[in-house]
Amino acid sequence: MKSNLSTKNSIYNYNNSNNSISDSSSNVLANFDFSEIDAKDPSLSEGHKLIYNREVPFELRLEDNDGPQEVASFEAIRCKILIGGEENNPIQIRLELSCENDLFFHFTSDIDEEAYKVMQENQKLTVNFSEFCNLLKRLFNNCINEPQSYISVFIMQKEGTGRLDFIQNIEYKFIELLSIDFVNSPDDTVRKQIGYRYNALRTKMEMMQDRIMTINNIIKIKNPSLIHQINKAPYKFNMYAKSNNSSMMK
């Protein structure tokens, strides 16, 4: 599997530009309890337990058997690791990939101990199946935290399959660490995921709006002059922006 320096730098720049946004979003949402919403995730419907859920910078490629790979694009892909059984002794490991910018992008990989033995033999992996979850977490986190050294490349086939390659850059030499095969999720699964994501987002927005209204009402009672200043602030900002724009055009 080949990659290049432009790929490395593009992912690095993409990751850095989104860190501040994701961090601030996490801080805002940290005070809300979304456990009831999260429990309705269709990914959990078969009894799996979610142990990892983060957005990871991916290089996406579409491979055509009749021609060369199309030019790569870069996306933040939601990566979920789910397990059947206990985390230190799983019966099955399921990986799910989804994308906020493409609601129909949804791929799944189910790996049990027998399937892992084949992977282990073919790719000369040294970790046991019980340690595979920790390896996956570490690789995903490395791609987030060290994008100049670790790259996740997802290659999609037109027949609906995909392959995720984890690549490490060591002094301009690219080493393939792990490859995992995926399949496009069934239409019914995709529909359920889209419905859940829409409803979850709407419910979270309603919760945040209710919180803002509650805070607003408290301020009205405790400090009416402050709420008056807050309401005037957008008007002052707009007037300031218009004034600046006018002076720049002269």
Feature roles, as predicted:
Residues 12-14, 52, 116, 150, ...:
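Sequence-level detector for tyrosine residue identity
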Residues 48-50, 108, 120-128, 132, ...:
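Short amphipathic alpha-helical molecular recognition features
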Residues 126-147, 200-219:
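A short, charged
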Residues 175-250:
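Intrinsically disordered, low-complexity acidic regions
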